């Protein structure tokens, strides 16, 4: 190794380190430093990194950009603060307000329409048709906006993309039977009477039908009430459960796998059936030839099925297919098969219904509107063609946003305020049903309150959150997280509540079971659970006990004392220790220190 050259060029790295970290008395000030300068930001900074080209922006961003260009400033006004008490019926309407809103709904129900496709002929060009559709769609949106603004009526968020309505128009035009799939727990909310009128406007011979999905959640008596109601409305109805059919198909598939050695016998049976079908087909051909010789009878009216009255029976998959095959006897759009259009809200089970009928997954299932971009045609059988329309949220009247959350129209994971929805749930589901379902004890009303009132959202969520272990960082039950679980149980049918038809009182239509568990008093619960259930609440008895209780004053001593015959009690006071004649050093750890948070844990109780 050569000798180190001391007179060579200086080391660049060492010079940089000295310049950066050197502790010299005098430091050279370069001309390009920021010393004694001020950044005024009085010009446009073209060299900033967040400069980006804007070619497309949302309506809100466009509004803010226009206001910024106009020199408009926005300031938050922190006046008129409203205190929301979670121990009241927050976000719900009173009985008088509900009656007034129902009257408004009945008065303006005829104005609740869906957009119509403008009339067109073969001479109409594509540009003229698109222009007419856009104008009609804008007029429809303007009418609904004026209805909401003038009458202060709350409506469900409806589809605002014209392309989705174009898909509905095409489905209606090519369908012989238009089936509206509704939720059995609230069929009238998901039924669009104006869609039925539009179907008849397109072609009077077309037929409307309602398929009540999730009907396994209803009893036979409840289905009978709805069948009678739709009979009075003059519309055919069928009751079906896609989830029940899917479970049966899975069970049958498992049974087939279990009986795998019998596959050969099944194949022989299939061959025998094929041979018998061939002989039956030959006989049918002979009968058909004889039938053609009989003169046809003319009848202007459409023939009706022998069983025109709606049946409350829950149909199976094969029964529903046979029902769809025989329900329509008018002129068909395509002579070879009957076309059945499937229309429905998202989250009512439209895709699940189609998949259960096809016995394989043909349509993607999603609770989000817009999953299906274009209508699809699927052959259910050689003479039945299903036409699946994209999921459409049609305009409908509701009382509050809590209604939309409980009916699955608004996503629960995106809700901002859980209190109104949980309050509405507590009004619909009795206290003892909630306690039996979740195995919890909900706090009883305080003195002076109505003992029969439904629980508030805070009372239910505190008990549920503590029971499930959903706690916040400060040791209190997490109410927002508990609310999402409880609301999803309601939407999924685990907490069952079904709305009655207008002709039947709600109290007679839906009844709840009696209490299944024994009544547990709050005094039997652990102290920590009692305090968690009574956050910011105290009874007069608790106030009296706290005010008149003995509160001895004493000094808090930390660590060991220098008096061998004196020891610390649990409350921090000094008491007599062991016998003076005994050996004080026995069974005593000299350096023992008790944690203060354990000694004074009663001060941290919430």
UniProtKB/Swiss-Prot annotation:
Domain of life: Eukaryota
Coiled-coil intervals, chain numbering: none
Modified residues (Phosphoserine): 276, 279
Regions of compositional bias (Basic residues) in chain numbering: 584-600
Enzyme class: hydrolase
Gene Ontology biological-process annotations: nuclear export; protein transport; regulation of insulin receptor signaling pathway; ribosomal subunit export from nucleus
Main localization of the protein described in the UniProt heading: cytoplasm
The protein, known as: Large subunit GTPase 1 homolog
Gene3D superfamilies the record matches: 1.10.1580.10, P-loop containing nucleotide triphosphate hydrolases
Gene giving rise to this polypeptide: Ns3
PROSITE patterns with a match to the protein in the record: G_CP
Protein EC: 3.6.1.-
């Amino acid at each position: 190794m050569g000798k180190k050259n001391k007179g060579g060029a200086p080391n660049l790295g060492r010079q940089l380190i000295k310049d950066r970290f050197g502790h010299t008395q005098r430091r050279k000030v370069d001309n390009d430093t920021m010393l004694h300068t001020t950044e005024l930001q009085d010009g446009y900074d073209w060299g900033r990194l967040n400069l980006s080209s804007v070619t497309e922006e949302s309506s809100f961003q466009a509004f803010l950009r226009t206001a910024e260009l106009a020199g408009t400033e926005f300031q938050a006004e922190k006046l008129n603060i409203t205190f929301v008490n979670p121990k009241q019926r927050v976000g719900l309407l009173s009985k008088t307000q509900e009656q007034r809103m129902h009257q408004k709904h009945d008065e303006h129900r005829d104005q609740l329409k869906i957009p119509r496709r403008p009339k067109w002929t073969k001479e109409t060009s594509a540009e003229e048709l698109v222009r007419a559709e856009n104008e009609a769609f804008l007029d429809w949106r303007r009418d609904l906006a004026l209805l909401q603004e003038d009458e202060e009526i709350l409506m469900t968020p409806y589809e605002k993309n014209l392309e989705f309505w174009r898909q509905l128009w095409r489905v209606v035009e090519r369908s012989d039977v238009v089936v509206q799939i509704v939720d059995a727990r609230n069929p009238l909310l998901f039924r669009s009477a104006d869609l039925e009128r539009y179907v008849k406007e397109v072609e009077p011979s077309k037929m409307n039908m309602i398929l009540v999905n999730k009907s396994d959640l209803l009893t036979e008596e409840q289905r009978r009430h709805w069948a009678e109601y739709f009979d009075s409305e003059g519309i055919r109805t069928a009751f079906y459960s896609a989830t029940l059919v899917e479970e049966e198909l899975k069970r049958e598939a498992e049974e087939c796998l279990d009986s795998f050695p019998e596959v050969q016998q099944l194949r022989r049976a299939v061959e025998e059936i094929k041979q018998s079908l061939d002989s039956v087909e030959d006989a049918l051909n002979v009968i058909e030839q004889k039938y053609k010789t009989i003169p046809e009878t003319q009848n202007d009216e459409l023939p009706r099925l022998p069983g025109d009255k709606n049946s409350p029976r829950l149909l199976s998959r094969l029964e529903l297919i046979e029902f769809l095959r025989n329900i329509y006897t008018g002129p068909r759009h395509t002579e070879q098969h009957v076309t059945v259009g499937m229309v429905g809200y998202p989250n009512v089970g439209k895709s699940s219904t189609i998949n259960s009928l096809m016995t394989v997954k043909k349509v993607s299932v999603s609770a989000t509107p817009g999953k299906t971009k274009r209508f699809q045609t699927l052959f259910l059988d050689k003479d039945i063609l299903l036409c699946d329309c994209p999921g459409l949220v049609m305009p409908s009247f509701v009382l509050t946003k809590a209604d939309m959350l409980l009916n699955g129209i608004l996503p629960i994971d995106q809700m901002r305020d859980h209190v109104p929805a949980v309050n509405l749930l507590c009004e619909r589901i009795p206290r003892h049903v909630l306690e039996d379902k979740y195995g919890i004890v909900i706090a009883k009303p305080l003195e002076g309150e109505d003992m029969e009132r439904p629980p508030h959202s805070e009372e239910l969520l505190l008990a549920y959150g503590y029971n499930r272990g959903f706690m916040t960082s400060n040791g209190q039950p997490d109410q927002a997280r508990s609310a999402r679980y409880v609301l999803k149980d309601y939407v999924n049918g685990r907490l069952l509540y079904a709305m009655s038809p207008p002709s039947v009182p709600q109290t007679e239509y839906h009844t709840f079971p009696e209490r299944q568990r024994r009544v547990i008093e709050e005094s039997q619960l652990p102290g920590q659970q009692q305090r968690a259930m009574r956050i910011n609440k105290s009874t007069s008895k608790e106030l009296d006990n706290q005010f008149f209780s003995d509160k001895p004053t004493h000094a808090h001593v930390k660590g060991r004392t220098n008096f061998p015959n004196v020891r610390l009690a649990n409350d921090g006071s000094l008491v007599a220790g062991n016998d003076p004649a005994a050996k004080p050093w026995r069974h005593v750890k000299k350096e023992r220190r008790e944690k203060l948070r354990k000694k004074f844990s009663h001060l941290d109780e919430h």
